[in-house]
Amino acid sequence: MFSDYASRFLAQSRFSSVDQRNFKYPTSRSNLQSVSIDRNSSIDSHETDLSAGSSSLHGLNSLIDSGSIHWQLREQEQSNSHISRNENELFSKENSIYNGNFSENLGVQPNPQTISHESVNEEYTELPYDAHLPSEQKVPDRKWGLTFGFLTLALFTYSFLMVWRTNPNIPPATSPYAAIQKAFPLFHKDAIICMMLSVIWLFCLVAIPRFLYFLLASVPLTMFAFAVYLLKASRIHLETSIQPKLMLLTGIILLVAPILLSYYVWRRRIHFETSFNIIRLACRVIADIPQITLIFISFLFSFYVLIFIWVRLFARLFLRGSTLVGSVWVLPRSSWVLASFYSLHFLWLCTFFHALQCAIISSIVSQWFFYRDTKSSATKTNLVSHFFYHVVSNQYGLCAFSSFLVVITKVPLHFLPTWLRHVSRIVYYMFSKTSASYVTSPLTLAYASIYSVPYMNASKALYQIEQLNRVGLRRRSYYFSKYTLLAARSLLAIGVGVTSWNYSIHENGVFYGYIVGLLGGFLAWLIIGAIEGGLSMIVDALLICSIIDISSCQGDPNGSHCFEAWQLFESNGY
């Protein structure tokens, strides 16, 4: 009995001494120093009481049998834990006062009205709300959602008026309208094939662990095969057509791309295992919540319907105000200007649907990440339907604003020279005080949808996070996993575009076959994006939830809600 007491007392004394040695008190903080003095005095008083109790009894055996030792140890442990909690609270409040960020109203979610550039870090460490608990319904960026709705309604109204006023039987077979109309059966076949391949691809990722290695190895080989195919097809002799030259140029690009891709993969071969494990963790989320596949399939069919409605309306533009000169169909400049506006709005519309999908998936992943072990009577189907309704009804403005910023910021930067990109980023930073890379990042939309805050506030929050250093992040496993998923999407889009282009040349005319190829590739890009993009959205949401979790548990893996995510993102430096 005495040995048990002695070992327990020595262990507790050693733990207390180690804790006191490791705890560093700030020299300029009087509150914490007073707490330290009170703690030492309370420990001394407990030791005095223990020695007094020992001397007052008649023997060691009676002291041990009385049970006072156990009572005193429990009292000391409770008092020490209470003092530790007070110290932590005082330390956090004093830090907030010292930094000028202290606020009396501490909520679970960031306040979209009071969030500022200086206080985003403290609000970022708070966990998102539980979907099973009642919460305040907020509609961030509502005016942008209404603006997007009015513009879409106006554009479709004009399109239906144009359909009513134009005659599809006038143009000859060499017009763009005739080429697009003849390619519609091919588009339907390509869309069905893309949907089947995307579903099979997702099933293989979830069911076959080593499928990613096969996918990464097949990308350069398939691109090389497409390059040889285009170089061979460019030998056809077509007068008054630039398509052989375009085929030759595209074939050369596809011939050089596998070499650059192989070099990039070889230099980052050390990130193979970590990046593949990140994708496997995303597949685990799908396996735990299989209802996410219903979100994927619903957006898959939404893109399918949207594309074919828009393509038919877009083809009607080439009937507007046209005149026939000989056998050539001449288009006025206004038709090309309207076609440009149609293309930009369609790009905004597709990005809006993509943002809706990202917001829904990010909310579901955050619920799985933080509350998957919480007992609740709600089923997973109810959870998915709740977030679907919440995003569609309350976050449509957020999705509209984020998609608008992506279209006007990210798309032009891809076509500008390098020096103009730097100049545009500087000008953008002068007006928004935030880097353009954070404004167009999918991580910003994931954070904004999880906390239901305005989009610009979310970009400011991410701008303050040290873990998201954009310079170092591009060299890490997170981006390699994203590029692996993007490679599969690009491969299918290139394949569909090349086959549509070649089919249009040999079967339906030669003058505007490249338009058919571009539409076919864009069709495949959007359809496979509903699956591949959804998996990439899960990876983004896991990264955001991991950063929130790491900030809330102060980097301690024992306090993490998902140890696998902490091991993949924090221990490997993302």
Curated annotation (Swiss-Prot):
Interacts with atg9. It comes from the Eukaryota. Required for the normal organization of the preautophagosomal structure (PAS) and for the correct subcellular location of atg9. Glycans are attached at residues 40, 101, 457, 558. It is a multi-pass membrane protein. InterPro entries: Choline_transptr-like. The gene is ctl1. One of its GO terms (biological process) is transmembrane transport. Disruption phenotype: Impairs atg8-processing. The chain crosses the membrane at residues 144-164, 189-209, 211-231, 246-266, 291-311, 336-356, 396-416, 434-456, 485-505, 511-531. Disulfide bonds: none annotated. Belongs to the CTL (choline transporter-like) family. GO terms for molecular function: choline transmembrane transporter activity; transmembrane transporter activity. GO terms for cellular component: endoplasmic reticulum membrane; Golgi apparatus; membrane; phagophore assembly site; phagophore assembly site membrane. It is found in: Endoplasmic reticulum membrane; Preautophagosomal structure membrane. This is Choline transporter-like protein ctl1. Keywords: Autophagy, Endoplasmic reticulum, Glycoprotein, Membrane, Protein transport, Transmembrane, Transmembrane helix, Transport.
